[in-house]
A protein has these predicted regions:
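N-terminal leader/targeting and pre-domain segments
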Residues: 1-27, 105-115
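Thiol-based oxidoreductase modules, predominantly thioredoxin-like and allied folds used
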Residues: 11-12, 31, 47-50, 54-68
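Structural micro-motif
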Residues: 73-84
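Local sequence-structure signature of Cys/Sec-based thiol-disulfide redox active-site neighborhoods
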Residues: 16-49
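Mobile acidic interaction elements
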Residues: 3, 30, 41-43, 65-68, ...
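Non-catalytic, surface beta->alpha helical segment in thiol-disulfide oxidoreductase systems
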Residues: 82-115
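Short hydrophobic/charged patches on amphipathic alpha-helices used for structural packing
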Residues: 18, 67-70
Length: 115
């Protein structure tokens, strides 16, 4: 998928996902498929959110190539965003959403970890 800027998103795989989650206290994983037209539209939106939430590490994973991780996190629909905090899943965001909605959902996922 040509719209991915490697400087903005870390690519993770079945093998590297666990280390990624362990290494980054606050992280967001965007799950996608190459043939998904919505995923192509979604990347620029998530990229913009990643710039505004610069204290969070963003990564992407092609679930066609990484079926084990997709199964482990029950990813059946793309695009899907998984929000992690301290190695735990805090929220799943499924389907296309606006930039405002994504940013708000991510912020709320982290806000609930402190109550």
């Amino acid at each position: 998928m040509n719209s991915i800027n490697p400087d903005e998103f870390i690519e993770v795989t079945d093998e590297s996902l666990s280390d990624f989650i362990k290494t980054h206290e606050k992280c967001v994983l965007l799950c996608w498929k190459e043939k998904c037209p919505y995923c192509r539209q979604f990347f620029p939106i998530v990229s913009s959110v990643s710039h505004e939430l610069s204290n969070i590490t963003f990564a992407h994973m092609n679930i066609d190539k990484n079926k084990k991780a997709a199964k482990n996190f029950n990813v059946r629909t793309v695009p899907t965003i998984i929000v992690f905090y301290q190695r735990s899943v805090k929220k799943g965001i499924i389907g296309m959403k606006s930039k405002f909605a994504i940013k708000n959902d991510i912020r709320l996922a982290f806000a609930t970890t402190f109550f």
